[in-house]
Amino acid sequence: MKSFEDAKYEFIDFMSNFQSPNDSLQFLDWLKEEAIEEFISNTVPEELVVKRKQLNEVALYSRSQVPNFEGINSTENLQAPKNSEEGLNFVNTVHVDSFLYDDADVEELTEEGKIPTHFCKSCGTKDVASAEMITHSMSREDLEFVFEGLLPDLSGKTILDIGSRLGAVLFGAFIHSDAQTILGIEMNGEHCDLANKTCLRFGMNERIKVIHSELSTKIEVLAQADVIVLNNVFDWFAPIDVQVQLWQIIRQNAKSGSLLVTIPSLDDALRILPQNAGIDLKTWVTPRPPFRPDRVSKNKLDESISSIFLYSVN
């Protein structure tokens, strides 16, 4: 094993052997911009390795209980969003559950032809376009970012996931945080049954509670929550007038000081609704940076803060 002084002198000697000063500068740039970050990213604490393994096991079990890669069951009533800025619909969109299938899984399914990557704009011709891939669940990587880096220590706190589906956020919160109470509210009974089954199998039912209900009939849970998670929550599942009502319910009942984790940003979620659902974001919430950015790699931090948003309620 080398001492620090030995390594330092060997490095200086190594740098003196480049053919030109330009080569040595290029090497230092690479070291600074890529190699060091990659080394740090690959140096994962043992505790985090264990957590990742646990969440992977939960995801694989959940996947075995779901008949398709979409994570959508036959009793769900999905509706193509009429107010989508991207013009998303059932023809140009592919649904893939990112909790059940990570990037490597998706690549494999695509290569096998099980996930379509294009759609025909005019049947019978070569007029094709790339399909848009969306998910209604957070990936395991994103869950790690949210509960390890984005949010503060949640010991003794209550988390509420609105539209908890198969339970991805609930499981991520259980494994990656010390939250005392983890609530999921979900209107689809099949999803609730599977989430509860998974909780029992992995011994998570002491801290996790899945509520089979619409949000409008369980308003009181909003006032209990210290953290509220809203992940692509309404636009594929409710008509526009109902979306407006639901956002108003959240606006009126989320307690001051609570944190909102949203995908997409609140600006984007409300902009597509009539008159921003009557909500003035400046008076309601304050955007927040990650509480513990040092706990995630810079690459993951840069990637995630552009797609996962945090606010505190004023």
Name each model feature, range by range.
Residues 187-314:
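Domain-level detector for long C-terminal conserved domains
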Residues 167-179:
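Conserved SAM-binding loop of SAM-dependent methyltransferases across substrates and taxa
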